[in-house]
């Protein structure tokens, strides 16, 4: 992943708090922790990423 240039983005709502950053590289979605940019990167296919976003939207991951 480091050999491919990526434009990392994070939510403007995160401020200076730790947050995930997302990059779209080579038809895949990469995520990493903003406070550890040289740390591990998770790679997802577009289908996996869409499934994750659908879960977020419907509250599947809410800690209640």
Question: Residue ranges of each PLM-predicted region?
Answer:
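Positively charged, low-complexity terminal tracts
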Residues: 1-64
């Amino acid at each position: 992943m480091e050999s491919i240039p990526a434009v990392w983005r994070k939510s403007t709502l995160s401020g200076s708090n730790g947050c995930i950053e997302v990059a779209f590289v080579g038809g895949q979605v990469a995520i990493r922790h903003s406070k550890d940019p040289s740390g591990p990167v998770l790679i997802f296919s577009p289908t996996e990423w869409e499934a994750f976003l659908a879960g977020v939207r419907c509250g599947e991951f809410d800690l209640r």
